[in-house]
Structure formats: structure tokens, C-alpha cells
């Protein structure tokens, strides 16, 4: 098989979020097999405590890199063996579905695969914080019912034989969360002591430590995995896992659709070699408020739909409320999170989190696209404008319904065009005459001699979302770009 057809799917996320289940569903849909990237499921013993997939959960899909180590061994050669397994699957015409959340093994494996010419699409599962702890607690309860205590007793016996009865919670299978937490219970059980309280406290610690480990993995995803995927230009869809009732519609279906599109060369996923046109980008300025007329929100959503239909990417101020949130969430829902880039100052991020009652890193924010947090407003403006300047033909700036901030940013890009800093189009979506006063003011400014007709024409006016795209299709009638030397 040629290197250009070496496709793999990555399913990543923290513990207890449903990676195994989704990996199986995707593998079934793309004629694939699963490669597990888990530093504990690779051990032969400890199937329950490490949440190793059961035959029923595998559902006929072959899984690799699971259960091949003895209890006291370490996965020293994991990456080399996993990359070799990728090659073998490729030779047999199977698509590898890499599933895991190991903070130590995942990135080395991905680097090894990419260096060998593999192409990858990634799906990142993010837990909803309102349900995550409860899901983990239920998972531990299920482990208990499945025979957790008996299995841990077996690991204690292995410890006696292989480690001379000296506990080492940093070695082999005994690193797994649950063993150390329930160790006092296992010791007391052997001496016929009172175990009930030790069992209760051990299970509580196991649940809490699993939850904390999941949050550590989430931080790793934010700080290491996501930047890596972005730097390597790997398409990444982030999906929020809430509960079982929303799994099929909110997680499984969009993930399978993305994986299938990627593997079978559908138009939904495309690669952009150097000689292909740059994607078209629009930067929108709009209110963080919804206004008191639903038509303003509908106009924003309409523009989001038109952007999807025309394969236009969006960069905006990163807010999740009002007009800004409406267009961002609409486009993400239709085109995926990579179609939208929100750039928000840290101060506004904290303010919005406080007002909404959500943590600034809440996974619910993923439905508004990728997010970059910057220190100040000036940096935000510079980065947003640069994305439009770097975009393909028809990229430009659009003003939607809003207040002071909307007008301030809109007039800044108009002024930058006037000064020759950029030559992109600037359009105003004048929904139901919302900006009629501004249009009249502009005419009066020309009439009074403060600007000429040429400068007045920098701003174009549209009354519909489709009209906005048509306005930006037309290059501005003049440009002063290059006339002044800007550092």
C-alpha cells in the first residue's frame, strides 16, 4: 500500500470517557482494528481494575497491545512494537484505530507513525464536568460487582511471589489506581481484621484518585496533545460526552462520519498541499449579547450556515454568548471545530466563566471551536486580522449586530485598510436596518468632506448572509497597501 493511503484514526480522551466503546464503533465502520495505547491495559493480569475491554465490549474487533506483559514488566518497547503493528495492519488492508489516553506513550507513538508517512484524523472525547465524577463512581461500582476485590487479591499474591511481599506501587501492574487505595483492606482481610471501613475508604479514594487522574489527562490534552495535533495540521474533532442518552447522536454518529470521510476520501476531510488554494477566512465582529429581537441571532446563525456551504473558516473574539456564540456554534455544528478559531483575552475568558458559572476549561466550550487565550485585546486583534490577511481569496471582515466593542473593532479594520495595512474587504450585515444610522452618518461624513468617496467605499453593506459572501467575493476597488512602510 502506498504511503499516501496509510490512514489511521486516533481516539483520545481521559479515563472513563468511553474511548473503548467509540474505538470499536469506528473500527467496525472503517474495516479497522484497534491499537490500545494504555500503559496498564498492556498487562496480562488486572483486567478489571485497568478497565481492559472484555470480549463482549470488543464485539469481534481485534485489539492489539493489550495483555502482552507480565505483572512485573514495564512497557519499555511499547512504541516500537506499536509502530510495527501499524505496519502489519496496513499490509493486511486494515485501518488502525489508535485508542488511548496515556500521557507517556501517546505522543511518542504518534511521532513515530507520522515520521513513517502515516496520515491521521483525531477525535478527542471530553467529559462534561457535571456528569464526569458520577460516571467514574458508577464505573468503579461496576468493577466491584465484576469481581474487583478478588482480582486485587490475586495481584497481592503476585506481589508476594514476584516482589518478595514488599509492596511497590510504582512498578508493573501494581501502579494501577485501585491497588494502593485498597491495599490496607487487602492486608486486613488476610488477618481477619475489621475490613468494612477500610473497604469503604479505599473505594472512595479509588474514585477520587481516578477522577483526579482524569483531570490530569485533560490538562495534558490541553497543554500537549492538542498543540501537537495543531502543529502537525491533523484534523481533530472534539466531542463532549454527557451521558448514555446523548451518546449516539452527540458522539458516535459525528465521530463515525468524520472517520469514514477521512478514510474513504470524502470531500468533508481534505488535505491542503502547498499548491492548493488557501482556505477562505472571515473575521466577524458581533455582540456578546443576543439583543431583544431574535432576528439578530438568526442572522448570525444564517451566516454560519452560509460559511459552511462555501467552505469558509471563521475567526472571532472567542465568546460563547450572544451573536458571537450563535455564529460560532452553528458553524462548528456543521463543519466541525477546526472551522472556527476563537481568540480571547484572558481577562474576558475569566469574566465569561464567572458570568456563566462554568470553569474556564469546561469541555462545553469545545462546541464553539478551537480557542486561543491571549494576554490583551491588542494581541487578539492582531492575530485575528493576520488570519484574514493569510486567508485565501474572498477573505475579509464582517460586522454583525452589536454595541461599542463591535463598532470599535469594525472601524479599526476599516482604518487599517485606509492606511494600507491590509487590502481585504469589509462588510456590514445590516439586518432589518439595524445599521441605517451608521450608513447615514457615513454619507454625512463624505458630504462634510472628512473622507472621500473612495474611502467611503471601503465598507460595503449587505442585507443577507448570502449578500455578505458576495460582497467579499468582490475585491475592494482600490488598495493603498505598500504605500506606507509599516513595521
UniProtKB/Swiss-Prot annotation:
EC number(s) on file: 2.5.1.27, 3.2.2.n1
Region of interest called Adenylate isopentenyltransferase, as start-end residue ranges on this chain: 1-266
Cellular component per GO, a single term: cytosol
Keyword field: Cytokinin biosynthesis, Hydrolase, Multifunctional enzyme, Transferase
Annotated region (Cytokinin riboside 5'-monophosphate phosphoribohydrolase), positions in chain: 267-487
GO biological process, one term: cytokinin biosynthetic process
Domain of life: Eukaryota
Reactions it catalyzes: dimethylallyl diphosphate + AMP = N(6)-(dimethylallyl)adenosine 5'-phosphate + diphosphate; N(6)-(dimethylallyl)adenosine 5'-phosphate + H2O = N(6)-dimethylallyladenine + D-ribose 5-phosphate; 9-ribosyl-trans-zeatin 5'-phosphate + H2O = trans-zeatin + D-ribose 5-phosphate
Induction: Expressed during infection of barley and Brachypodium.
Binding site for substrate: 352, 380-381, 403-409, 415
Presence of keyword Magnesium: no
InterPro entries in the cross-refs: LOG, LOG_fam, P-loop_NTPase
Sample GO molecular function, one term: cytokinin riboside 5'-monophosphate phosphoribohydrolase activity
Listed Gene3D superfamilies: 3.40.50.450, P-loop containing nucleotide triphosphate hydrolases
Mutant lacking the gene: phenotype: Impairs the production of cytokinins, isopentenylaldehyde, trans-zeatin and cis-zeatin.
PANTHER family noted in UniProt: LOG FAMILY PROTEIN YJL055W (PTHR31223:SF70)
Family of this protein: In the N-terminal section; belongs to the IPP transferase family.
Name of the protein in question: Bifunctional cytokinin biosynthesis protein
Amino acid at each position: 500500500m502506498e504511503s499516501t493511503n496509510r490512514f489511521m484514526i486516533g481516539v483520545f480522551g481521559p479515563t472513563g470517557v468511553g474511548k473503548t466503546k467509540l474505538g470499536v464503533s469506528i473500527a467496525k465502520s472503517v474495516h479497522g482494528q484497534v491499537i490500545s495505547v494504555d500503559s496498564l491495559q498492556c498487562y496480562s493480569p488486572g483486567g478489571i481494575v485497568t478497565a481492559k475491554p472484555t470480549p463482549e465490549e470488543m464485539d469481534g474487533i481485534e485489539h492489539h497491545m493489550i495483555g502482552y506483559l507480565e505483572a512485573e514488566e514495564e512497557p519499555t518497547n511499547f512504541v516500537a512494537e506499536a509502530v510495527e503493528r501499524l505496519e502489519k495492519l496496513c499490509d493486511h488492508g486494515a485501518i488502525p484505530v489508535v485508542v488511548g489516553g496515556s500521557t507517556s506513550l501517546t505522543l511518542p507513538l504518534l511521532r513515530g507513525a507520522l515520521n513513517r508517512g502515516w496520515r491521521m484524523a483525531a477525535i478527542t472525547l471530553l467529559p462534561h464536568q457535571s456528569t464526569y465524577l458520577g460516571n467514574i463512581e458508577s464505573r468503579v461500582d461496576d468493577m466491584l460487582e465484576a469481581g474487583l476485590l478478588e482480582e486485587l487479591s490475586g495481584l497481592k499474591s503476585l506481589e508476594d511471589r514476584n516482589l518478595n511481599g514488599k509492596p511497590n506501587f510504582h512498578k508493573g501492574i501494581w501502579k494501577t489506581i485501585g491497588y494502593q487505595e485498597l491495599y490496607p483492606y487487602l492486608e486486613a482481610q488476610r488477618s481477619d481484621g475489621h475490613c468494612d471501613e477500610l473497604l469503604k475508604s479505599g473505594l472512595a479514594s479509588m474514585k477520587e484518585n481516578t477522577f483526579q487522574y482524569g483531570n490530569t489527562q485533560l490538562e495534558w490534552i490541553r497543554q500537549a496533545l492538542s498543540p501537537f495535533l495543531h502543529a502537525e495540521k491533523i484534523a481533530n474533532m472534539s466531542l463532549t460526552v454527557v451521558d448514555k442518552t446523548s451518546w449516539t447522536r452527540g458522539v458516535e454518529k459525528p465521530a463515525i462520519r468524520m472517520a469514514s470521510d477521512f478514510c474513504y476520501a470524502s470531500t468533508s476531510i481534505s488535505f491542503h498541499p502547498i499548491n492548493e488554494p488557501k482556505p477562505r477566512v472571515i473575521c466577524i465582529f458581533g455582540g456578546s449579547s443576543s439583543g431583544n429581537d431574535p432576528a439578530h441571532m438568526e442572522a448570525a446563525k444564517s451566516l454560519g450556515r452560509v460559511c459552511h456551504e462555501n467552505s469558509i473558516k471563521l475567526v472571532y473574539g472567542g465568546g460563547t454568548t450572544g451573536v458571537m456564540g450563535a455564529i460560532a456554534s452553528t458553524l462548528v455544528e456543521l463543519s466541525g471545530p477546526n472551522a472556527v478559531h476563537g481568540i480571547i483575552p484572558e481577562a474576558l475568558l475569566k469574566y465569561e466563566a464567572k458570568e456563566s458559572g462554568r470553569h474556564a476549561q469546561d469541555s462545553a466550550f469545545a462546541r464553539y471551536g478551537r480557542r486561543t487565550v491571549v494576554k490583551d485585546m491588542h494581541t487578539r486583534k492582531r492575530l485575528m486580522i493576520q488570519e484574514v490577511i493569510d486567508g485565501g481569496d474572498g477573505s475579509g471582515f464582517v460586522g454583525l449586530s452589536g454595541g461599542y466593542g463591535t463598532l470599535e473593532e469594525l472601524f479599526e479594520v476599516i482604518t487599517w485598510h485606509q492606511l494600507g495595512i491590509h487590502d481585504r474587504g469589509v462588510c456590514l450585515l445590516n439586518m432589518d436596518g439595524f445599521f441605517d444610522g451608521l450608513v447615514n452618518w457615513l454619507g454625512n461624513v463624505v458630504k462634510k468632506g472628512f473622507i472621500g468617496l473612495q474611502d467611503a467605499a471601503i465598507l460595503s453593506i449587505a442585507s443577507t448572509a448570502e449578500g455578505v459572501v458576495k460582497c467579499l467575493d468582490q475585491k475592494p476597488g482600490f488598495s493603498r497597501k505598500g504605500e506606507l512602510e509599516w513595521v
